[in-house]
From Swiss-Prot:
InterPro entries: Thiolase (IPR002155), Thiolase-like (IPR016039), Thiolase_acyl_enz_int_AS (IPR020615), Thiolase_AS (IPR020610), Thiolase_C (IPR020617), Thiolase_CS (IPR020613), Thiolase_N (IPR020616). This is Acetyl-CoA acetyltransferase. PANTHER family: ACETYL-COA ACETYLTRANSFERASE, CYTOSOLIC (PTHR18919:SF107), ACETYL-COA C-ACYLTRANSFERASE (PTHR18919). It comes from Paracoccus denitrificans. PROSITE patterns: THIOLASE_1 (PS00098), THIOLASE_2 (PS00737), THIOLASE_3 (PS00099). Its main location: cytoplasm. One of its GO terms (biological process) is poly-hydroxybutyrate biosynthetic process. Homotetramer. It catalyses: 2 acetyl-CoA = acetoacetyl-CoA + CoA.
Length: 391
């Protein structure tokens, strides 16, 4: 039976909150990577059957931002484009959906990925019913729609505190993990390891043009001493800080998916085959542990064991949850996030799933790795995972 394959991949640099991409809507970031994956695959844009993009923060962003990106870059008006919102897992779930589309014969070529501008998430107020007098509360849609647990009425950071308590993960462990992530990302950036996956973004302003070609959130020279001085963010006695958590970020990433037979017919060499994918649910209070059941399901579907994996990209929403995932999965930590993770690189929520997939794909190619896994935790208590294989 033919498999779904990824024939090209690309991502933008990850921008800091209110940083270089502060005024760039998500669909414009998305358009950049859509164009890049089509060009890198060497196919005619008119042959793209469908575009599927993850995006969490869509309030006031206009109708169907995936369609906006699709049309902006000149992909066919005759083919469809749509957004999914599975919170932090969106950008990876779209790739699983793309695989399903091509394997079922519902599409021949699908572009999948994610786009997000956390900087442009608006504040909003419910004024339609009218308010005769008194103050009016403005709602931060970034927090409400992206970072707030709807079931327990608290921030995602509190779920990380829950995991830290239940898994007995100390502040020291979290800080050490976070510094290691920063140091690995710094080393990777200096060595040019992200260059192949990144598409430079040109920012136009009254002062001229600026080209952004590197992730801007990575903190060079991060030390444990500095990390230890950051105050807890969600509880006075807590262990989760801004330093050992991922950031608020902007960015986009995409891959181009078709069947193995289609790639062979076109003479294209895939970056990897999609061996399996899975989602799973957990208690929303410990949402950060979602990758544990999701990864186990994906491995079982692929017929693999943890020991078969050569590389893992496990999103670092928080150091606490990342440590818990590593512990319970029992995989070799030396193969996990070898170039740093979201604590260092950043977490543009709807795009992160495809960002980690990009990083995994290019590192597998660099190391000639045969089996890899990408996984993320998801707000609301879920996880998503996808297994890749190379010949």
């Amino acid at each position: 039976m033919t498999k779904a394959v990824i024939v090209s991949a690309a991502r933008t640099p990850v921008g800091s909150f209110l940083g270089s991409f502060a005024n760039l809507p998500a669909h414009e970031l998305g358009a950049i990577v859509l164009k890049a994956v089509v060009e890198r695959a060497g196919i005619d844009p008119s042959e793209v059957s469908e575009t599927i993009l993850g995006q969490v923060l869509t309030a006031a962003q206009g109708q169907n931002p995936a369609r906006q990106a699709h049309i902006k870059v000149g992909l066919p008006r005759e083919s469809a484009a749509w957004v999914i919102n599975q919170v932090c897992g969106s950008g990876l779930r779209t790739v699983a959906l793309a695989a399903q589309q091509v394997l079922l014969g519902d599409a021949r070529i699908v572009v999948a990925g994610g786009q997000e501008s956390m900087s442009l998430a608006p504040h909003a107020a419910y004024i339609a019913p009218g308010q005769k007098m008194g103050d009016m509360k403005m709602l931060d849609t970034m927090i409400k729609d992206g970072l707030w647990d709807a079931f327990n009425d608290y921030h995602m950071g509190t779920t990380a505190e829950n995991v830290a308590g239940k898994w007995e993960i100390s502040r020291a462990e979290q800080d050490q993990f976070a510094v290691a992530s920063q140091n690995k990302a710094e080393a990777a950036q200096k060595a040019g390891k992200f260059a192949d996956e990144i598409v430079p973004v040109t920012i136009k302003s009254r002062k001229g043009e600026t080209v952004v070609d590197a992730d801007e959130y990575i903190r060079h020279g991060a030390t444990l001493e500095a990390m230890e001085n950051v105050r807890p963010a969600f509880s006075k006695e807590g262990t989760v800080t801004a330093g050992n958590a991922s950031g608020l970020n902007d960015g986009a990433a995409a891959v181009l998916v078709m069947t193995e037979d289609e790639a062979a017919r076109r003479g294209l060499t895939p970056l990897a085959r999609i061996a399996s994918y899975a989602t799973a649910g957990v208690d929303p209070q410990i949402m950060g542990t979602g990758p544990i059941p999701a990864s186990r399901k994906a491995l079982e579907k692929a017929g693999w064991s943890v020991g078969d994996l050569d590389l893992v990209e496990a999103n670092e929403a928080f150091a606490a949850q990342a440590i818990a995932v590593n512990r319970d999965m029992g995989w070799d930590p030396s193969i996990v996030n070898v170039n740093g993770g979201a604590i260092a690189i950043g977490h543009p929520i709807g795009a992160s799933g495809c960002r980690i997939l990009n990083t995994l794909l290019f590192e597998m190619q660099r190391r000639d790795a045969k089996k890899g896994l990408a996984t993320l935790c998801i707000g609301g208590g879920m996880g998503v995972a996808l297994c890749l294989e190379r010949p």
